[in-house]
């Protein structure tokens, strides 16, 4: 008898016939006692978990991060203390709005998330390729996503919906200037930049706090597609970015990104005409210089997309010692929402999955729940306790006290909204070709948008730069002058 691998049930019992169901005679009905059939169908019915409400379409890879410059003057995070320190990572890139099998050529921000498996526990970088977002407060997150998702009656994405929302949300204007540039249609995941979008706090061993933003810069350079190029690719292929990333790694052409930090002293927080902790505002490099931190190299593809790329969970609040979230209102909401969605999608024990499990030891009294596979055998499942063998809190790791800004609690309007100043900065920094692409992409997207919605958006664009509004209006046949007289 030859040595062969038997096909088995999930109970380990060898299967003799995987081609025919068990029936009552040659022409009779199928029997419910056919365990092989019932198990196979029942498992198939449950193969999928709910897709992510945002960032459903994604590709990922394993790799390493090497610290190139010590950050000890800013943070006590151990993996950033010494040059040459290597940290395992898993990175996931994604589109934001569209479903799991949608084309990767669609105009959309790109998610850029990295899980660092540090010796002090996991650290999640959760960002996008674009440096700002549509809104500044998490209470509006469901609304902006609903506007961009398909109409719940037709299941068709409708420009009238999201442009209506944008027109009444002037803080979104800077994001529009990025998203409707060609950077809204990147050529590949290997050629996108990454931004933390939010500011975070770094704390060093002396207790000094600074605000930081983080930036990833691809060594391959930033490469984008025109609308026409994206359409040509989409006619042939829905998966071009995932395929490009996978094949590059398989061929040994490992993608790399340099990580940079921008630093702001808290005493300078009020020295700007905008709030630096507002997610709709950028920290431009000439004002906040980049400092090189290290380099990420992705060198191994997942062995199982579902178990790794689909099951990985990120949260911007997953931080190691020496890092804290800032007071950014959008960030504050994400701290809850991101882990909550993984508990819904994957289950309460999603952190026990290998892709999410830290390399650092885990010791606590969080037990049981749906489908646990980590065995916790101690009879002591409470704390404090008098047993020296059980895990105890360590005051060395207590979070440092932080100053609270503001006088009263309440639903307060954001200070220094400056909704158009940064959009003007972006417009001024664009080349003639980049301005032309931005205008064309908006005009094309407005082909079926109602005129009243166009006018409200044009009024916003006019407050960015009259030329910007004038060029978009000319492309859409709107008489701009009669709608902006009160803005002059």
Per-segment meaning from a language model:
Residues 1-488:
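Active-site-adjacent core segments of small-molecule enzymes
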């Amino acid at each position: 008898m030859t040595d062969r691998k038997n096909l088995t049930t999930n109970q380990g019992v060898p299967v003799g016939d995987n081609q025919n169901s068990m029936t009552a005679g040659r022409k009779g009905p199928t029997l419910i006692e056919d365990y092989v059939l019932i198990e196979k169908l029942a498992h198939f019915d449950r193969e999928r978990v709910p897709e992510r409400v945002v960032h459903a379409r994604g590709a990922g890879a394993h790799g390493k991060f090497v610290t190139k410059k010590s950050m000890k003057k800013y943070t006590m995070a151990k993996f950033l203390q010494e040059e040459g320190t290597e940290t395992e990572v898993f990175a996931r890139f994604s589109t934001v709005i569209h479903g799991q099998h949608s084309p990767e050529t669609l105009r959309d921000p790109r998610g850029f998330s990295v899980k660092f498996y540090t010796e002090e526990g996991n650290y999640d970088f959760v960002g996008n390729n674009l440096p700002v977002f549509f809104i500044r407060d998490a209470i509006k997150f469901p609304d902006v996503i609903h506007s961009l998702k398909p109409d719940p009656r037709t299941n068709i994405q409708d420009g009238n919906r999201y442009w209506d929302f944008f027109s009444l949300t002037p803080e979104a204007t800077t994001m529009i200037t990025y998203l409707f540039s060609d950077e809204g249609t990147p050529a590949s995941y290997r050629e996108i930049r990454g931004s933390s979008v939010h500011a975070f706090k770094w704390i060093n061993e002396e207790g000094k706090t600074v605000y930081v933003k983080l930036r990833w810069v691809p060594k391959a350079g930033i490469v984008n597609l025109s609308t026409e190029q994206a359409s040509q690719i989409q006619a042939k292929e829905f998966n071009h970015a995932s395929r490009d990333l996978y094949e590059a790694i398989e061929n040994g052409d490992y993608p790399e990104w340099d990580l940079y930090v921008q630093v702001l002293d808290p005493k300078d927080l009020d020295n700007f005409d905008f709030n630096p902790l507002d997610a709709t505002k950028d920290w431009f490099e000439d004002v906040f210089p980049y400092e090189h931190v290290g380099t990420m190299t992705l060198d191994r593809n997942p062995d199982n997309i579902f178990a790794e790329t689909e099951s990985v969970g990120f949260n911007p609040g997953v931080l190691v010692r020496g890092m804290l979230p800032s007071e950014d209102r959008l960030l504050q909401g994400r701290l809850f929402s991101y882990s909550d969605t993984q508990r819904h999608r994957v289950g309460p024990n999603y952190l026990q999955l290998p892709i999410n499990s830290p390399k650092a030891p885990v010791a606590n009294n969080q037990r049981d729940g749906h489908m646990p596979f980590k065995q916790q055998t101690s009879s002591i499942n409470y704390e404090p306790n008098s047993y020296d063998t059980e895990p105890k809190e360590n005051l060395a790791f207590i979070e440092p006290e932080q100053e609270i800004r503001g006088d009263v609690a309440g639903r307060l309007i954001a200070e220094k909204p400056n909704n158009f100043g940064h959009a003007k900065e972006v417009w001024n920094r664009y080349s003639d070709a980049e301005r032309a692409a931005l205008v064309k992409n908006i005009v094309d997207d407005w082909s079926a948008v109602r005129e009243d919605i166009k006018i409200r958006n044009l009024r916003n664009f006019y407050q960015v730069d009259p030329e910007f509004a004038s060029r978009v209006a000319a492309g859409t046949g709107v008489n701009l002058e009669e709608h902006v007289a009160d803005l002059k």
